[in-house]
């Protein structure tokens, strides 16, 4: 296969048709490029301006013609221009040199920091790891964030759906996860910006620099690589940038043998771009106008995100649900691959409970006794049932007041409010805003803390002592401080 690819490398074709981002190219007989090969088109347009673009072969049309999708704008492209077959798929830079950098779908830097300092590159199209190479035993990925580790734990090498609207703290949660995997697991992160707003991509980069996730003075100390294909890019770039980011993550897993976090924002835009390309290629649309290959496209991306015996890629994917319709084929296909969901709640955010992760709506396939153990499972279910009872009582409290509740219900409400407050915690990346030192809470400390609240051991402590702290020792210290201030 490699020999065949080399045989077509350098073969020159001629652009015969341009329809938006799709171009037809004619090659000499017997020298057609393979599907997914990259074509390079360079030259001058009619205005005398230089053009340089890369396109990916998608279809073999017959009559020595292929159809390709451009990875950048085709403005000024004219029929008769020369297209050169590179003989290989699009390849992107990989390794430590990518950390702290922003790259596009082709791995070219777009942050005005000079070239990416790495010699290693890897093709964006490759097979998922073999079954014999996979780590099949489920293992919890500890994040140090209490609400996630207790109620909706992440699977190492799993996929997590992140649901939340604007202003709920998605970005801060992502930054904290990047910080914690670097400090506690010695891992790195890759962020794939797929089809989202350019302004948001820029804001995220600036926030990463402010919080120390990207070290602007010494990029080698950065903890994340960024790969962007934003809303203004052609559909080809938005369709492939997720694979570019995944390829960078695979290098850290397979070569450096590290645990990697891969963020995809937004997985729906990946599907949307595939739908646009499918229509441009003339394929018959499927349900709701999506591409007929929807399941295959999503599966090829998701199956590469996994744990191997060498390392793991744990993926957190922001999921946009069009018109809040969970039965739409795009989110429905994505859900089939998810191991956990983290749902952010506007109600909790408005109460000042951060991270605003909804303890009742967030789910995980890992939360079962056989995986997390009986103690963890029972504690998590007890926390959820207490919060559920509190939710049911809120209407009664709003109409009649707290005094009309039975003694047992009042105790439940008191403990539930403490549990709700204890689910908050200060983040390392938010220290510059809150003035509070960040806290990484080990899972056993988290379980112990919630057990003590539910058993009634801490009924005499004030509710305020449970807000924005790490473990129970800090709750007791804060309660002591509140009491001494009240006496003083």
UniProtKB/Swiss-Prot annotation:
HAMAP family: ATP_synth_beta_bact. Its EC number is 7.1.2.2. InterPro entries: AAA+_ATPase (IPR003593), ATP-synt_VA_C (IPR055190), ATP_synth_F1_bsu (IPR005722), ATPase_a/bsu_AS (IPR020003), ATPase_alpha/beta_chains (IPR050053), ATPase_F1/V1/A1_a/bsu_N (IPR004100), ATPase_F1/V1/A1_a/bsu_N_sf (IPR036121), ATPase_F1/V1/A1_a/bsu_nucl-bd (IPR000194). GO terms for cellular component: plasma membrane-derived thylakoid membrane; proton-transporting ATP synthase complex. Belongs to the ATPase alpha/beta chains family. F-type ATPases have 2 components, CF(1) - the catalytic core - and CF(0) - the membrane proton channel. CF(1) has five subunits: alpha(3), beta(3), gamma(1), delta(1), epsilon(1). CF(0) has four main subunits: a(1), b(1), b'(1) and c(9-12). It catalyses: ATP + H2O + 4 H(+)(in) = ADP + phosphate + 5 H(+)(out). It is an enzyme of class 7 (translocase). CDD domains: ATP-synt_F1_beta_C, ATP-synt_F1_beta_N, F1-ATPase_beta_CD. Produces ATP from ADP in the presence of a proton gradient across the membrane. The catalytic sites are hosted primarily by the beta subunits. The gene is atpD. This is ATP synthase subunit beta. NCBIfam families: atpD (TIGR01039). GO terms for molecular function: ATP binding; ATP hydrolysis activity; proton-transporting ATP synthase activity, rotational mechanism. ATP binds at residues 164-171. Keywords: ATP synthesis, ATP-binding, CF(1), Hydrogen ion transport, Ion transport, Membrane, Nucleotide-binding, Thylakoid, Translocase, Transport. It comes from Synechococcus sp. (strain RCC307).
């Amino acid at each position: 296969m490699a020999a065949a690819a080399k045989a077509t490398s350098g073969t020159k074709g001629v652009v015969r048709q341009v329809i938006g981002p799709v171009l037809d190219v004619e090659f000499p007989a017997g020298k057609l490029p393979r599907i997914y090969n990259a074509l390079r088109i360079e030259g001058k347009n009619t205005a005398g301006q230089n053009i340089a673009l890369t396109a990916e072969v998608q279809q073999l049309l017959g009559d020595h013609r292929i159809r390709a999708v451009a990875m950048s704008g085709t403005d000024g492209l004219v029929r008769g221009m020369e297209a050169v077959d590179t003989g290989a798929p699009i390849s992107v830079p990989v390794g430590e040199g990518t950390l702290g950098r922003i790259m596009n779908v082709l791995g070219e830097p777009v942050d005005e920091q000079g070239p990416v300092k790495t010699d290693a590159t890897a093709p964006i199209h490759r097979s998922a790891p073999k079954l014999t190479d996979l780590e099949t035993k489920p293992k919890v990925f500890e994040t140090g964030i209490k609400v996630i580790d207790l109620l909706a734990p992440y699977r190492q090498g799993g996929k997590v759906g992140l649901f939340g609207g604007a202003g709920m703290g998605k970005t801060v949660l992502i930054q904290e996860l990047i910080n914690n995997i670097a400090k506690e697991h010695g891992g790195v992160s890759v962020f794939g910006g797929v089809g989202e707003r350019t302004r948001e991509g820029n804001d995220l980069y600036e926030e990463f620099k402010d919080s120390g996730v990207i070290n602007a003075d010494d990029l080698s100390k950065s903890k994340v690589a960024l790969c962007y294909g934003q809303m203004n890019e052609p559909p080809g770039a938005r369709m492939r940038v997720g694979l570019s980011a995944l390829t960078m993550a695979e290098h850290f897993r397979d070569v450096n043998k590290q645990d990697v976090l891969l963020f995809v924002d937004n997985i729906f835009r990946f599907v949307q771009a595939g739908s646009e390309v499918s229509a441009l290629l003339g394929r018959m649309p499927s349900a709701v106008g999506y591409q007929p290959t929807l399941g295959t496209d999503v599966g090829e991306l998701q199956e590469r995100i996994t744990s191997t015996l060498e390392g793991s890629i744990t993926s957190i994917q922001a999921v946009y649900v069009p018109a809040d319709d969970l039965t739409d084929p795009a989110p429905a296909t994505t859900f089939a691959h998810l191991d956990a969901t983290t749902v952010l709640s506007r109600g909790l955010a408005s109460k000042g409970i951060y991270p605003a992760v909804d303890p009742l709506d967030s789910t995980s396939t890992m939360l079962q006794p056989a995986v997390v153990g009986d103690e963890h499972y029972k504690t998590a279910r007890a926390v959820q049932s207490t919060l559920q009872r509190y939710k049911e009582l809120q209407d009664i409290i709003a109409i009649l007041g707290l005094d009309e509740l039975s003694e047992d219900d009042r105790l439940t409400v008191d403990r539930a409010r403490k549990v709700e407050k204890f689910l908050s915690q200060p983040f390392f990346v938010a220290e510059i805003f809150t003035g509070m030192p960040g806290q990484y809470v080990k899972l056993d400390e988290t379980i112990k803390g919630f057990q003590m609240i539910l058993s009634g051991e801490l009924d005499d402590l004030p509710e305020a002592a449970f807000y924005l702290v790490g473990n129970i020792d800090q709750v007791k210290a804060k309660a002591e401080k509140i009491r001494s201030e009240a006496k003083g």
